[in-house]
Amino acid sequence: MTDTQQPELTEDGRQRRTIKSFVMRAGRMTEGQQRGLDKGWPLFGLELEDGLRDFDQVFGRSAPRTFEIGFGMGHSTLEMAAAAPEQDFIGVEVHKPGVGALLNGVMAHNLSNVRVYSCDALEVLQGCVADASLDRVLLFFPDPWHKSRHHKRRIVQPAFAELVRRKLKIGGVLHMATDWENYAEHMLEVMNAAPGYRNLAADGTYVPRPEERPVTKFERRGERLGHGVWDLKFQRQE
């Protein structure tokens, strides 16, 4: 899934300067994706400029709330939202074709529990999401930036962990997944050292793939080729 922009943050999670953890890609819009933007955005799109939001008011109810960083083409978001109509989902993605694809799917499935931002997810967390208001934060298959000189671009850093911790409710969970073992090790190192979290893995490493995380076509292909996927779950304790 597509990563987000990585601002360099201070220890308390405030933005210092911008480091990109994604590369903007030009891409054609399909008819369905364009329809999603044209017709779906006025119904389900949210703007960063609107600032702090009361999501109970946005969704018209109080329900368990999931925030997904970088939903790519939106397949997993759509599957999760359709399977859990009692929950609300806020998805953030910078690439317009993916935004259009998700919105088109939301309309096709007649879903009312999805809202979408098309901008930097960390700016949304900082400026639009109240502290202690999220039940889950999802980060599935972010850009691994596998070259050592690019590791600073990885979104999972100590300040990211602190920002997410502030936005999660006590007992809320950060769920990450990656198919790069080195990035999984990096995630584990950062999160095990992050204050205020508990690793939900029994052995303090990785959890088995949770049933609620959809399996993507890329993951299935990787499994056929013998590639691994690592899931991490960390729960806010304080």
UniProtKB/Swiss-Prot annotation:
S-adenosyl-L-methionine binds at E68, E93, D120, D143. Substrate binds at K147, D179, T216, K217, F218, E219. It is an enzyme of class 2 (transferase). Pfam families: Methyltransf_4. The active site is at D143. GO terms for molecular function: tRNA (guanine(46)-N7)-methyltransferase activity. GO terms for cellular component: tRNA methyltransferase complex. The keyword Plastid does not apply. Its EC number is 2.1.1.33. SUPFAM superfamilies: S-adenosyl-L-methionine-dependent methyltransferases (SSF53335). Pathway: tRNA modification; N(7)-methylguanine-tRNA biosynthesis. It comes from the Bacteria. It catalyses: guanosine(46) in tRNA + S-adenosyl-L-methionine = N(7)-methylguanosine(46) in tRNA + S-adenosyl-L-homocysteine. Keywords: Methyltransferase, S-adenosyl-L-methionine, Transferase, tRNA processing. The keyword Chloroplast does not apply. Belongs to the class I-like SAM-binding methyltransferase superfamily. TrmB family. Catalyzes the formation of N(7)-methylguanine at position 46 (m7G46) in tRNA. This is tRNA (guanine-N(7)-)-methyltransferase. The gene is trmB.
